[in-house]
Amino acid sequence: MAKKRDKRLSNINEIKTQIINVKTELKNGVFIFSSPMTIGEFAQKINISGTEIVKEYFLKGKMYTLNHILSEEEIADLCFKHGYDFRVEKEINASNFLDNIEFEDKKEDLETRPPIITIMGHVDHGKTTLIDKIRKSNIVSTESSGITQHTGAYQIIYDNKKITFLDTPGHEAFSAMRARGSKVTDIVILVVAADDGVKPQTKEAIAHAQAANVPIIVFVNKMDKPSKDLNRLKNDLSVSGINLEEWGGDTPIVYGSALKGEGIEKLFENINLQAEILDLKFNPKRHPLGVVIESKMDKGVGSLTTVIVQNGTLHKGDFLVAGPRYGRVKAIYDTNKKPLKKVGAGTPVFVIGLNYAPSAGEKFVGINDEKYAKKLSQEREDSEKQEKFLQQTQTISIRRDNDKKIFNIIIKSDTQGTAEAIKDLILQIANDEIEVIVVSYGIGVINNSDLLLAQTSNSEIIGFNSKPNPNIKQQAEDLNIQINSFDVVYKIVDYLNEKINKMVKPKFEKRTIGRAKILKVFFYSKVGNIAGCLMEEGHVKSDSFVKVYRKNKLIHDGRVETLRKGPDEVKKIEKGFEFGLRIKNFDDIKEDDQLEIIEEFRI
């Protein structure tokens, strides 16, 4: 039987016609470029010595090397200095075409697609309870089919209309993942507890939605709580930039109780109404374009990727380019584990067969030509390698300049999205003396490759829901490679903060803690002069530092050797008491000398 002809509109022609390659060159006195470059590369293009440029920066007090990456402003300054004009041209290539190419569809080919909803809110405001109530199932359960759900992507039907929900993690540690969620989202449901009001994560969710220009529906949860304060809540929402319909704005507000199932239908009604206003369309007659929601390596099926098609139709057997690689879709399942032959826009599905785990938030494109899919993915891989090389080169240059201590980390997690979120979180843990470098991050169990990389890069391995087997653990111990596994993200943060603090050279400052006056000097042949003193202010300890002043002039800066009260050695003397004091290696004390008592404090 002849293979059925694929009548879907190909994406290839629009990609080929809109790709713009910019040649970096000096042409007719104008330096044309599209992206940052190193001093060495710039010097080569304008035919001068790179060392000359390095010297120019040195005279300005900047210690650059030939591998320093020049910013657009620095390139412009160098062009003017050497007598050239410049022009920055936007390049559309394999690495960025999905963000820049426009795919045009005929109006008569368009159909309505389901709205994609992201539920956001502060921790403990009832977001998970609302999700559970909407799904009418326990979100944390693991299905028995061999495919475990980690996506929080699901679809319901209300009033004969499909609604797709994305659940983004509720902790601010996952800001990056939540921001990605906003990019594929049509409507945000903002869950706010009636008895707690607007909190930091509420404001963060509002900021993400507004930055992505996504409309918001507010769901006021826990209306059954007697301590609710709706006036304060609405005022706080207004201050945070939410213009409620009740106050003449355009943001709907729904009141309810997720626990009791109250307000859910009203919420669905508002979603469908908002979706009608948005007039969400897609062309089912073209090859797919969409976004990766999550990906992981599943023991039973290999690579398991959750995607949402944003335009076109995804078919079993399609070639997808996502990130620097491509793969063929061997199977498609909906979120109820039902196998599908194809899926349109707005419906979350599991895809099997990509043989790799693309990053969460990565855009994908369906290509009906394997050779071209391979070409695109290879070009993207080459571009990413070049970008990574430039970043590493710049990092090495910065390290030389700032002379910081380096703490290298390798991250292994159960999902790609979580690994990236942890990476972003870890990179925020730094100070003036320690630079944290994430050498590598990925998914799966901790293995031999991780040990090899850790050994060559002097890295520590951090696992999240990822542990080494006993053999790998023993090898790590033999190689003196540290592995720490966690199941709570913020335990990683606490651990790393503690470790970094131990790496920092402690800093101290001296503070005055007391003042005393020498009343009389006693001489003992075995020890030398002992000062008989009165503690006038504060206190003195047996290990305190002491400054000796005579007629307001500092004559000695030393340390207490012995501290006595009567015949007994003591550790501390308080204000108002007389005491005996021996200053280490100093005998030139006299009556009426003033003592300033100093203590070192760690800062």
Curated annotation (Swiss-Prot):
Sample GO molecular function, one term: translation initiation factor activity
Functional summary from the UniProt entry: One of the essential components for the initiation of protein synthesis. Protects formylmethionyl-tRNA from spontaneous hydrolysis and promotes its binding to the 30S ribosomal subunits. Also involved in the hydrolysis of GTP during the formation of the 70S ribosomal complex.
InterPro entries registered for this protein in UniProt: EF-G-like_DII, IF2_II, IF2_N, P-loop_NTPase, Small_GTP-bd, T_Tr_GTP-bd_dom, TF_IF2_bacterial-like, TIF_IF2
UniProt keywords, alphabetically: Cytoplasm, GTP-binding, Initiation factor, Nucleotide-binding, Protein biosynthesis
Family: Belongs to the TRAFAC class translation factor GTPase superfamily. Classic translation factor GTPase family. IF-2 subfamily.
Principal place of residence: cytoplasm
G2 as annotated region, ranges: 146-150
Chain segments carrying region G5: 257-259
Signal peptide location: none
Region named G1: 121-128
Compartments (UniProt record): Cytoplasm
Binding site for GTP: 121-128, 167-171, 221-224
Region (G3): 167-170
Occurrences of domain tr-type G (ranges): 112-279
Pfam families: EF-G_D2, GTP_EFTU, IF-2, IF2_N
UniProt xrefs under PROSITE patterns: G_TR_2 (PS51722)
Parts of the chain that traverse the membrane: none
Organism field: Mycoplasmopsis pulmonis (strain UAB CTIP) (Mycoplasma pulmonis)
Region (G4): 221-224
Gene Ontology CC: one annotated term: cytosol
UniProt-recorded name of the protein: Translation initiation factor IF-2
